[in-house]
Regions:
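Short, glycine-/small-residue-enriched flexible loop/hinge segments at domain edges that mediate gating
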Residues: 279-292
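Short beta->alpha junction loops/turns
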Residues: 142, 289, 318-319
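Conserved beta-strand-loop-beta-strand hairpin that lines the nucleotide-binding pocket
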Residues: 54-69, 113-233, 304
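A short acidic, amphipathic alpha-helical/loop segment
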Residues: 183, 271, 299-300
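Residues at alpha-helix caps and immediate loop-helix transition turns in enzyme cores, especially N-
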Residues: 268, 296-297
């Protein structure tokens, strides 16, 4: 019965691949393969017996291993030493492209905690299972969104989410380019930052089951990547380059991150535009935005291009109402 055996293996692989981000994995599998729930649970029971998944509090999870490290945030601590001493051993045998992504992401995020958090402790948790590896980096400092709010004089900590989406925004221009979080968030399969009840999520359309209660923190960074990922750092860098490969001169800004329901004023527009003059190509993503005001549109699509003619600013995913206001602003002759 090779056909039946192959189908069973396919079903179990589906369960393993989707169990982390789906609480009701049985229903999802039943729907995907048009089989009964009892049939699905036979496959789940087999995976439990094989020690590939575990059941906890009524939910199923991939069997995983955790490794925890705690560091004093002092002048002798550095991200490269931590990587060499404790972290890199967890990635022996992974493809070169996966290795490169983890080197880049870990170094950037650990350094961020080291130099920006103003905390006393930095904690790292490496969690790995059959399919992917996760790293959690947490600190007990000021909190990333609060730090950004104070440095950029923002109205609310939630406004910091928009600044992170822009890129080239940093609280320490002398030492940092503002590219670390931006590119790290794009490179990984999943990237999230938790701080003071606020979440920055690089993949908000996906459902995540992440336990943030295991450790007290001011900021917690979560990175996840499949062990056999085909992603390459170069491809992500090139995606945000318009001319020379590797030049970070393009950005895509989701307008929904503006932390307001009514986008009507010039002040709101200026907050979105802050720092975007540093790019050659700016794309504003209007997904989820129902309407915008005349003054808001005019500031972005008429005033800003006159002030910064070397920066191209365009819109995507604009509905009919939004596009009407954009066209009206572009065609205004003064």
């Amino acid at each position: 019965m090779p056909g039946v055996r192959k189908r069973g293996e396919e079903i179990r692989e589906f369960i393993l691949a989707n169990i982390t981000d789906n609480k009701n994995i049985a229903a999802l599998t039943s729907q995907q393969y048009a089989i009964s729930l009892p049939a699905v649970y036979k496959h789940i029971d087999r995976l439990v017996l094989e020690n590939q998944i575990i059941k906890k509090d009524g939910n199923f999870f991939l069997q995983s291993k955790q490794y925890k490290y705690v560091y004093d945030n002092n002048k002798t601590l550095s991200e490269d030493v931590v990587w060499e001493k404790d972290i890199k051993k967890h990635f022996s045998g992974v493809p070169k492209n996966v290795w490169n992504i983890w080197v880049y992401g870990f170094m950037e995020m650990f350094n961020n905690a080291l130099e920006h958090s103003k905390g006393k402790k930095i904690r790292v948790v490496v969690e790995e299972n059959k399919l992917f590896t996760c790293i959690f980096i947490s600190d007990d400092g000021i909190g990333i969104f609060k730090n950004i709010k104070l440095n950029f004089n923002l109205l609310d900590e939630k406004d910091a989410l928009l600044e992170l989406e822009k890129g080239k925004r940093t609280t320490d221009t002398a030492k940092h380019s503002g590219q670390g979080i931006f590119f790290t968030s794009k490179i990984f399969d999943n990237f999230m930052i938790f701080s003071n009840g606020i979440t920055f999520d690089s993949k908000p359309e996906k459902k995540h089951q992440i336990n943030t209660n295991a450790v007290k923190f001011s900021t917690l960074v979560y990175m996840r990547l499949e062990k056999n990922s085909f992603k390459k750092i170069r491809d992500v860098f090139d995606e945000y380059s318009t001319e020379s490969p590797g030049d970070f001169d393009k950005t895509i800004v989701p307008v929904r991150m503006a932390n307001t329901n009514d986008l009507v004023s010039r002040s709101q527009a200026r907050r979105i535009l802050g720092g975007l003059e540093l790019f050659k190509d700016v794309i504003l993503d209007f997904s989820g935005i129902e309407d915008i005001g005349q003054a808001f549109a005019d500031e972005i699509f008429r005033v800003f291009p006159k002030m910064y003619p070397s920066t191209s600013i365009t819109a995507k995913n604009a509905n009919e109402n939004v596009q009407f206001m954009i066209n009206r602003a572009i065609n205004t002759k003064l």
